[in-house]
């Protein structure tokens, strides 16, 4: 239940996986009623369902090999590139912009080697992403819950963006994950926001509502 619709000061999107009991059609109707503009982290088969309700998909998925198997592993580059080459045009054809990607596990490599590995794989896709005006967006995740995840600090992700050097590669900044890893949320947003294409919010601990029970509270 929502007491009043959203004011529209922020363009709100929600991740469907957090609300698994709802059918997507029903969920979209609820979202539209309260002023949410997007339902995200959906595969291509679901995009038309969202769009028929006048909503969008702020962060698309459907390419890649999951969180643990990402661009840090050169042995996966050919498979990853083939997957993204298929989905990037689909994102553009649907009128969407952001497509999620992942670094994968660290697997014992240094930060430097991780940058080099990810840069090598992702740069194979940048010309296609630029052609279709799609932004490949790597999510910053905590490596406590996602064991050994490489892209787990804002400064690491920002340096990868700098190395790739294209507006078509950016970061998904997740307040919940980064509060666990590093805190300093407001300063990091101010400093690194040019590298963000999208932001996820969630309280810590427990990814709860951002209220007075959480480490961060935005009234």
What are these regions (language model features)?
Residues 4-6, 73-171, 180-182:
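Active-site acidic/histidine proton-transfer and metal-coordination neighborhood
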Residues 41, 60, 101:
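Short beta-strand and adjacent tight-turn residues that come in two discontinuous sequence segments
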Residues 44-55, 109-110, 213-216:
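Active-site-adjacent beta->alpha loops and helix N-cap segments on the catalytic face
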Residues 47-61, 118, 134:
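Short acidic, glycine/proline-enriched helix-loop-strand junctions
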Residues 57-59, 138, 173:
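Hydrophobic residues in well-ordered beta-strands that form the structural core
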Residues 61-69, 203-204:
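Short, acidic/turn-prone active-site loops that include or flank metal/cofactor-
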């Amino acid at each position: 239940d929502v007491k009043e619709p959203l004011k529209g000061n922020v363009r709100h999107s929600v991740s469907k996986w957090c609300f698994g009991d709802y059918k997507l059609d029903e969920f979209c109707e609820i979202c539209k009623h309260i002023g949410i503009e997007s339902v995200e982290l959906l595969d291509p088969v679901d995009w038309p369902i969202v769009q028929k309700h006048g909503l969008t998909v702020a962060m698309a998925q459907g390419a890649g090999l999951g969180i643990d198997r990402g661009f840090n592993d050169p042995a996966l580059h050919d498979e990853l590139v083939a997957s993204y080459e298929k989905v990037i045009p689909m994102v553009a054809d649907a009128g969407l912009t952001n497509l999620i990607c992942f670094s994968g596990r660290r697997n014992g490599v240094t930060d430097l080697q991780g940058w080099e590995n990810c840069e090598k794989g992702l740069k194979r896709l940048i010309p296609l992403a630029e052609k279709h005006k799609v932004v490949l967006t790597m999510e910053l995740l905590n490596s406590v819950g996602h064991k050994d995840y490489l892209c787990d600090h804002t400064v690491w992700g920002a340096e990868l963006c700098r190395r790739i050097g294209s507006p078509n590669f950016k970061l998904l900044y997740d307040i919940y994950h980064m509060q666990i890893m590093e805190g300093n949320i407001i300063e990091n947003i101010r400093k690194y926001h040019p590298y963000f294409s999208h932001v996820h919010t969630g309280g810590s601990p427990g990814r709860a509502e951002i209220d007075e029970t959480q480490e961060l509270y935005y009234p």
